[in-house]
């Protein structure tokens, strides 16, 4: 209800334009093109909605050799939006509105779809955490992750972006990985393949998250050999998961081939990564979208993961893949040409990884809950950090905080100012 209330507030108070905007437009555009215009080339939407040429902000470009449209944003979000799109289309036809893919019902179907997947992600994450932590710890962790980071923003204000969907998929992949190692089955393998394929289909760089599966529970280097042996013993199930993932990814490769004549392309054109000069400190600590500057609550996760690494806790199995993934993911994000990821509240590149951070935060809360004085002090600090995060989120919604390239001077000038 809190997320839904936030969504309604955003779109009834004039805080945001239509949900399908900016990156959200590019992720969504496949649906009207495919199902309303029966066009897999994206040309019809360009002609009917954009005057024949997609605006530069969409990152939908003409491929130099074929002159066909190539969308930098893959089809995964559209696939996960398809059920809500079908409902919106039915309501649009029933109420005699224009079935062009961008009228009222389509707009809010796309927005509410993102909200739905965030809620679903929280439910899956809750189930995962309850296998390792007491209910009060789980409730506190989910509250901290939802309200103390930019997750609430991407569940409401910018819910048509990919991050809401990746949040769910990451939580589901963690849950399924643990269930698979608890008892490998065909059903779990199929679900792992579907989720793995969607992770790659929603945002290609997130494929690195799949490293969680082979490294789960590998707490020492000498265990790698036994892990390889285990996966080989269950090679039929691993093959099933890989085959399902390949089937899920295949439509994207077909789209690339149709548009460019290749199955693998750099859809951002000349834009890309600067792997030799990553902005790691900026990505983590700067006022320009630094992860821990804008979401200091996540420092609890760092402390919790460090404690888990030295403990015999049942959640320790997640720590090795979590640490490897977080290092790789931070390096990839910091190497992107626009390491701030454009206009956003906080660093949106890390919203996808919040299920990993949630495990560390839960461990931290469990640890401090054993000492009454420490628990009260931490509780006050967490409350204040969440309050600051929500206030700054509202500042962003009110256009008080800059969308990007925030400087210390700007931040100090508007700190705790409502308008």
Put a short name on every predicted segment:
Residues 99-121, 138, 142-172, 176, ...:
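Aromatic- and kink-enriched transmembrane "portal" helix at the membrane-lumen/periplasm boundary
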Residues 31, 142-143, 188-203, 210-214, ...:
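Membrane-interface alpha helices of multi-pass inner-membrane proteins
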Residues 131, 185, 221-240, 303-324, ...:
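Membrane-interface helix-loop-helix junctions at transmembrane boundaries of multi-pass membrane enzymes
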Residues 122-123, 224-228, 293-316, 357-364, ...:
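Hydrophobic, aromatic-rich transmembrane alpha-helices
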Residues 93-101, 120-149, 168, 182-192, ...:
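Transmembrane-helix signature of polytopic, membrane-embedded enzymes
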Residues 36-112, 337-338:
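Interfacial juxtamembrane loops and adjacent helix segments
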Residues 165-196, 212-213, 356-360:
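Specific aromatic-rich, kink-prone transmembrane helix
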Residues 212, 220, 235-304, 321-335, ...:
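Membrane-lumen/periplasm interface segments of specific transmembrane helices
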């Amino acid at each position: 209800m809190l997320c839904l209330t936030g969504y309604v507030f955003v779109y009834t108070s004039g805080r945001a334009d239509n949900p399908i905007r900016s990156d959200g437009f590019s992720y969504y555009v496949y649906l009207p093109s495919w199902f309303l215009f029966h066009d897999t080339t994206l040309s019809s939407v360009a002609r009917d909605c954009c005057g024949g040429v997609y605006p530069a902000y969409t990152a939908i470009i003409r491929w130099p050799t074929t002159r066909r449209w190539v969308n930098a944003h893959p089809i995964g979000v559209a696939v996960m939006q398809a059920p809500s799109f079908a409902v919106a289309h039915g309501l649009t036809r029933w109420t005699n509105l224009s079935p062009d893919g961008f009228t009222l019902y389509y707009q809010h179907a796309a927005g509410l779809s993102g909200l739905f997947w965030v809620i679903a992600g929280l439910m899956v994450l809750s189930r995962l955490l309850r296998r390792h932590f007491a209910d009060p710890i789980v409730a506190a962790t989910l509250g901290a992750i939802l309200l103390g980071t930019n997750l609430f923003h991407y569940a409401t204000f910018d819910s048509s972006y990919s991050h809401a969907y990746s949040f769910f998929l990451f939580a589901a992949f963690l849950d399924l990985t643990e269930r698979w190692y608890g008892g490998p089955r065909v059903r779990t393998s199929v679900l792992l393949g579907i989720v793995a394929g969607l992770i790659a289909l929603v945002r290609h760089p997130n494929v690195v998250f799949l490293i969680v599966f082979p490294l789960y529970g590998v707490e020492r280097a000498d265990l790698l050999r036994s892990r390889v042996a285990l996966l080989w013993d269950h090679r039929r199930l691993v093959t099933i998961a890989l085959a399902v993932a390949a089937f899920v990814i295949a439509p994207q490769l077909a789209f690339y081939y149709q548009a460019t004549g290749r199955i693998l392309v750099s859809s951002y054109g000349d834009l890309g990564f600067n792997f030799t000069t990553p902005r790691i400190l900026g990505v983590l600590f700067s006022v320009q979208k630094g992860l821990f500057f804008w979401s200091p609550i996540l420092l609890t996760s760092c402390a919790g993961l460090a404690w888990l690494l030295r403990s015999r806790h049942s959640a320790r199995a997640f720590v090795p893949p979590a640490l490897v993934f977080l290092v790789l993911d931070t390096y990839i994000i910091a190497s992107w040409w626009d390491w701030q990821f454009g206009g956003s509240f906080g660093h949106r590149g890390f919203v996808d990884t919040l299920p990993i951070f949630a495990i560390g935060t839960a461990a931290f809360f469990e640890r401090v809950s054993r000492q009454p004085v420490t628990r009260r002090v931490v509780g006050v600090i967490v409350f204040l950090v969440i309050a600051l995060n929500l206030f700054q989120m509202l500042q962003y919604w009110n256009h008080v905080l800059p969308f990007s390239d925030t400087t210390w001077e700007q931040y100090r000038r508007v700190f705790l100012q409502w308008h």
